[in-house]
A protein has these predicted regions:
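Intrinsic, low-complexity polybasic segments
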Residues: 161-162, 178
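Short, intrinsically disordered C-terminal tails of secreted or membrane-associated proteins
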Residues: 182-186
Length: 187
């Protein structure tokens, strides 16, 4: 079994009056992230990390901001497409570790909902998704509340194209998680 690691980083400017999408949910705040899509910085770094781990370039290559079809798009749709691309190449998500850097609002209360939404979109167990939040202690653009940054590291495993497709076409999530654990021990 081939194991690969990917890393993602993204920033978005914060602007008053925009909705603030983070981890697939709308977080109540006076400012939202500015971007071509819904500007969900957490989903964007997860997409970049997954694509990078599989050596499939980056989110900008697959969903360019010059293409009007992605204007205002829900980033969950981008993540679902990244997973489809990844699985077509025979990869499965092992785990995701991510960090959101933001002064305000405090996002820790929203992390459980983010994990639930992301797990559902990706077809993985919530235990495979770690989301942490921190500030920059009032330093830099994040500290001045001008923007939001996020980082993600992912681990993916090569399970083969046929198995990856079979895995997600016919098996319920609970059985997929049990089978994935068994495969890790066997391979």
């Amino acid at each position: 079994m081939k194991i690969r690691v990917g890393f993602g980083y993204d920033v978005h400017q914060l602007q008053e009056g925009l909705p603030f999408w983070l981890g697939g949910i709308e977080v109540p705040h006076t400012h939202g992230a500015l971007g071509h899509s819904d500007a969900d910085v957490l989903i964007h770094v997860i997409c970049d990390a997954l694509l990078g781990a599989a050596n499939l370039r980056d989110i900008g290559f697959h969903f360019p901001d010059t293409d009007p079809q992605y204007k205002g798009i829900d980033s969950k749709k981008l993540l679902a497409e990244v997973l489809r691309i990844l699985r077509a190449k025979g990869y499965e998500v092992g785990n995701i570790d991510s960090t959101i850097c933001l002064e305000r609002p405090k996002v820790n209360p929203h992390i459980p909902a983010m994990r639930t939404v992301l797990a559902e979109v990706m077809g993985v167990d919530e235990d495979a998704i770690s989301i942490k939040a921190t500030t920059t202690e009032k330093l830099g653009f994040v500290g001045r509340q001008e923007g939001v940054a996020a980082y993600a590291t992912v681990l993916i495993t090569s399970v083969g194209k046929a198995l990856a497709c079979l895995f997600h076409s016919f098996l319920p999530l609970s059985l997929r998680c049990q089978l994935k654990l068994t495969l890790h021990f066997l391979l």
